[in-house]
């Protein structure tokens, strides 16, 4: 699983996942499924915010080609992927600037158009079950919840899906592709079932296959949301985007 993750996710996402696990004292060599889950969640958060901006009239627009105008503002603030101290600093800054209610738990994004924090969920189970778990944990109507599954299903607070259909389809396509790639390597069952994972760990099973290239529709896109995470994040003059190919498996 670790080899699969390193081959099929952008190096920046892998690095952020490694830092996250280290911060919580988790060993990615042992908890490889969690490593894969964190990378997947990070990718969905970045894809959620990709190409979405707010123009001078306060309207939400999509800019996919070239660099966006300096007059455009990023619609989403990415909180996920930061260390906890910096993440709470960003949340506090948003609350002080917008008047938003401070959440009890760290959310994943902030939507400047709808003026709300967003909790993103990616589940291997039924979306409604995971949604209820999230809602019971957060216990706040102020934080918007949006759940995606690896089967193409989704569920959101009050059926408000925030993004346009094409943007959501891009996320669903990527998740379905990850599922297919895992299944082709015999990794999916252990990823879904902790019991199966333990059984495979005891046997010392390890996938040796190389990751095949992803479908062109997904692999050729770039991810403007992969930015250097630093304190200047909240400034209007954001740090430069890391223009890396979005989560592309290397071709042999």
UniProtKB/Swiss-Prot annotation:
The keyword Transmembrane helix does not apply. Keywords: Decay of host mRNAs by virus, Eukaryotic host gene expression shutoff by virus, Host cytoplasm, Host gene expression shutoff by virus, Host mRNA suppression by virus, Host nucleus, Host-virus interaction. The record marks 195, 198-199 as: Important for efficient shutoff activity and nuclear localization. The record marks 28, 65, 202-203, 206 as: Important for efficient shutoff activity. Plays a major role in the shutoff of the host protein expression by cleaving mRNAs probably via an endonuclease activity. This host shutoff allows the virus to escape from the host antiviral response. Hijacks host RNA splicing machinery to selectively target host RNAs containing introns for destruction. This may explain the preferential degradation of RNAs that have undergone co- or post-transcriptional processing. Belongs to the influenza viruses PA-X family. This is Protein PA-X. It comes from Influenza A virus (strain A/X-31 H3N2). The gene is PA.
């Amino acid at each position: 699983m670790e080899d699969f993750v390193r081959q099929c996710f952008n190096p920046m996402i892998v690095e952020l996942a490694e830092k996250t696990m280290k911060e919580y004292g988790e060993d990615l060599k042992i908890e490889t499924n969690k490593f894969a889950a964190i990378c997947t969640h990070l990718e969905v958060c970045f894809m959620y915010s990709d190409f979405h901006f707010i123009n001078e009239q306060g309207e939400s627009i999509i800019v996919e080609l070239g660099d966006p105008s300096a007059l455009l503002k990023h619609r989403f603030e990415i909180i996920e992927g930061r260390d906890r101290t910096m993440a709470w600093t960003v949340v506090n800054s948003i609350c002080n600037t917008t008047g938003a209610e401070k959440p009890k738990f760290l959310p994943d994004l902030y939507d400047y158009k709808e003026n709300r924090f967003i909790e993103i969920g990616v589940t291997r189970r039924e979306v409604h079950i995971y949604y209820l778990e999230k809602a019971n944990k957060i216990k706040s109507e102020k934080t918007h919840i949006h759940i995606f599954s690896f089967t193409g299903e989704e569920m959101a607070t009050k059926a408000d899906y925030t993004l346009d259909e094409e943007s959501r389809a891009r996320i669903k396509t990527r998740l379905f592709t990850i599922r297919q790639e895992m299944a082709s390597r015999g990794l999916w069952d252990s990823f879904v079932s902790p019991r199966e994972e333990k059984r495979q760990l005891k046997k010392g099973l390890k996938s040796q296959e190389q990751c095949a290239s992803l479908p062109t529709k997904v692999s050729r896109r770039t991810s403007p949301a992969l930015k250097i995470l630093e304190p200047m994040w909240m400034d209007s003059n954001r740090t430069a985007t890391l223009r890396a190919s979005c989560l592309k498996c290397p071709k042999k």
